[in-house]
Amino acid sequence: MLIWLVELSEYFKFLNLFRYITFRTGAALFTSALIVFLFGPTIINSLRIRQGKGQPIRADGPQTHFKKAGTPTMGGLMILAGIVGASLLWADLSNVYVVATLLVTLGFGAIGFYDDYLKVTKQSHKGFSGKARLGIEFIIAGIAVYFMMRTALASGTAGSTFGSSIAFPFFKDFLINLGIMFVVFGGFVIVGAGNAVNLTDGLDGLAIVPVMIAAASFGVIAYLAGNVVFANYLQINFVPGTGELAVVLGAVIGAGLGFLWFNAPPAAIFMGDTGSLALGGTIGTVAVATKHEIVMAIIGGLFVMETLSVIIQVGFFKMTGRRVFLMAPIHHHFEKKGWTESQVVIRFWIIAVGLALLGLSTLKLR
C-alpha cells in the first residue's frame, strides 16, 4: 500500500525508497516481527483463558510431551497478523501474485483455525473432516493458480503456453505444457506443501525455522525470477511481477522470528493448523508462481521427508499390520529412539539448511 506514495517522490525524494523491492522486503520483515512481538502476549493470554486445557496431547506419543499439556494452540493467528499486516503495508496490492498468495495464506489459515477449534473444544485429535478439508484447500489453491496462470499467459514472455507449463531445474527451455490441467497440478503442489508443513509441526520450533529457511530461499528465487537481468544471467525463466513476492516472504520471515520468540522451548504457544497450513500454502503458492515447483521439493525436502514417513507408515501398516517406524511423523520416531527434543529439532534444522543450499545451487547449474 505504501508503494503508492512513490507518486509523491517528486516532492519528497526519500519516498523513492519505496520503489525498491529489497527495501520493502526488509521493512516487511521488521514490521511483521514487530506486530507479533507487540500483540503476541495479549493473543497468548486470551487463547490460554479461552482454551483451558489447550491442545490435546497424543496418548501414544513420547512421555516427555505430557508436560506440555495446557499449552494453548492457534498461535498461527499471531503469524497471520504479522504476514497480512506487513504485506498490506509494504507489498504492491495491485500485483496478482501477491493477492493470490495472500488468498491462500488467509484461506488455509481459516481452515486450520476451524480444525484447531474443533480439536480444542472436543479435546480430540479428530478435527475437520479430512476429505472436506482437502476439498476446500484444493478449491482455494485452484482459484489462486488459475489467476496466476492467466497472468503468466498474458505476459507471454516465454511463449504463449509458459503460464500453464511445468519448468524443470537445470534446463531453462525444457517445459511441459499441461494446459488447464496446470490448475490441478499447481493446486496439488500448494495443498501438498500446506499439509507437509502441518505434519512437520510436532515439536517446539521444529517447523517454524525450516519454514523461514524456505521463505528466505524462495524470497531470493522470487526476486531473481522477477528481474529480467538476473533471470537472463542465471538462465532461469523470467516471470514478470513475481519479484513482489519477496516482500510477502519477508513478512513471513519476520512473523516467524516473532513467533519463535514465544515458541522456543518450553513453548508458550503452538502455531497449530492455523499457522502450519497457512505457512506451507504460502511457500507452495510462491513455488508455483515462480515456476520452481520441483525445486521446492529440494528446498522443502525436510517437509517431504516427514510426509513420506507418514505415507510409508500408514501404507505398510495397512498391507502387513506392522510398522516401519516406531512412530510417525519421523521426528517422533527419533524421539522414541532416545533423541531429546532439542537434538531432533536442531538436527532437522541443519538438514533444512543443507537442503535449502542444495536447492538454491540449482539456479546456477544450467
Curated annotation (Swiss-Prot):
Its EC number is 2.7.8.13. It is an enzyme of class 2 (transferase). GO terms for biological process: cell division; cell wall organization; peptidoglycan biosynthetic process; regulation of cell shape. Pathway: Cell wall biogenesis; peptidoglycan biosynthesis. Keywords: Cell cycle, Cell division, Cell inner membrane, Cell membrane, Cell shape, Cell wall biogenesis/degradation, Magnesium, Membrane, Metal-binding, Peptidoglycan synthesis, Transferase, Transmembrane, Transmembrane helix. It is a multi-pass membrane protein. It is found in: Cell inner membrane. Its cofactor is Mg(2+). The chain crosses the membrane at residues 27-47, 71-91, 93-113, 134-154, 174-194, 205-225, 245-265, 268-288, 294-314, 343-363. CDD domains: GT_MraY. Belongs to the glycosyltransferase 4 family. MraY subfamily. Catalyzes the initial step of the lipid cycle reactions in the biosynthesis of the cell wall peptidoglycan: transfers peptidoglycan precursor phospho-MurNAc-pentapeptide from UDP-MurNAc-pentapeptide onto the lipid carrier undecaprenyl phosphate, yielding undecaprenyl-pyrophosphoryl-MurNAc-pentapeptide, known as lipid I. PANTHER family: PHOSPHO-N-ACETYLMURAMOYL-PENTAPEPTIDE-TRANSFERASE, PHOSPHO-N-ACETYLMURAMOYL-PENTAPEPTIDE-TRANSFERASE HOMOLOG. This is Phospho-N-acetylmuramoyl-pentapeptide-transferase. It comes from Rhizobium etli (strain CIAT 652).
